[in-house]
Amino acid sequence: MASLFLTIISLLFAAFSSSVVEAAYSNGYTIPKLLPNPIDSCWRRNPYWASNRRALADCAVGFGKSAVGGKYGSIYVVTNPSDDPENPRPGTLRYAVIQSKPLWITFARDMVIVLRNELIMNSYKTIDGRGAKVEIAYGPCITIQHVSHVIIHGISIHDCKPGKSGRVRSSPTHVGSRKGSDGDAIAIFDSSHIWIDHCFFSRCQDGLIDVLHASTAVTISNNYFTQHDKVMLLGHNDNNVEDKIMRVTIAFNHFGPGLIERMPRVRRGYAHVANNRYEKWQMYAIGGSADPTIFSEGNYFVASDDPSKKQVTKRIDSGYDWKRWKWRTSKDVFKNGAYFVPSGYGTVTPLYGRAERFPVSHGSLVPLLTSSAGPLHCYSGRIC
């Protein structure tokens, strides 16, 4: 029965994937009528997206569903790619993200923003790169610390460098002395209701995305990751018991070539890893320590040709305790000898509220579901 089901799924995928993937990569004129990715199907069919950008805030799924970003604020347009960490100018990205009021931040044109120190975000902000090619690169990158309700969509963050010690403004009324940052693309500390969607990540000094210090209610979706060592860290220390509250959804991402480990690496909290594509990790794909709960559902794993690197999972510094950790696989597809080592007993089903739930497809559909991962080519008046 199981083999018959997989055969049917494969035939359906073969029949539809060609035209659908072509549509997804087009210049915005067409899009499949029944786009199965529930986030994209929420907004991408509307050619007038640029007239109602804030509708995107209704489209998240999973634990970060309630992130509203700047939905209830005004539109702010970045016109100036320069940066001053202490006294940012109006028109710059930093001037927008430090404001106390909600803002939906867009970009007047294509730009590469080289930050002079870490970009510290305030609550209720959306960075929306649709309609422009926006890169944050070659300097320190983004810090989300002690805040809530942040959406980052449609930008490229790459080649991030450590931030130096110095004074950095975090609000209109506060400038603080910072000790420096690690060189992550996005570092999330003690924050909640965060959604990172349709971004590109690569080649940073430290991690690409870190979710730390009891951060929770986070969704990381539709992103493209490539050419990096330590990709995604959920909890930075086994002794941080507060990370037990961490709830993170990782869905519809493409973990592409040149990645080594941590897709993600989890401590103590809960990770729902659903409908992601993994290509030839060089150490492991999903790892953890300190008794995290991990539910791998409907993913597509392609192992490297190295016979020593076929296992998807890795328990780190665990002794024999790992056998009771709840790590499960369901509806996953394993290619080129890839395999997942499950453990533990009891349910691992994510405790989503009604609005947070989303359909998770069989792993055989993941190449289709993730075909538009990364920033989209969006033009006003056309379907993205």
Curated annotation (Swiss-Prot):
Keyword Repressor: no
InterPro entries in alphabetical order: AmbAllergen (IPR018082), Pec_lyase (IPR002022), Pectin_lyas_fold (IPR012334), Pectin_lyase_fold/virulence (IPR011050), PEL (IPR045032)
Positions bound to Ca(2+): D182, D206, D210
Catalytic activity annotation: Eliminative cleavage of (1->4)-alpha-D-galacturonan to give oligosaccharides with 4-deoxy-alpha-D-galact-4-enuronosyl groups at their non-reducing ends
Keywords: Calcium, Lyase, Metal-binding, Signal
Top EC class for this record: lyase
GO function terms (MF aspect): metal ion binding; pectate lyase activity
Record-linked SUPFAM superfamilies: Pectin lyase-like (SSF51126)
Protein name as catalogued: Putative pectate lyase 2
Naturally occurring in which organism (per UniProt): Arabidopsis thaliana (Mouse-ear cress)
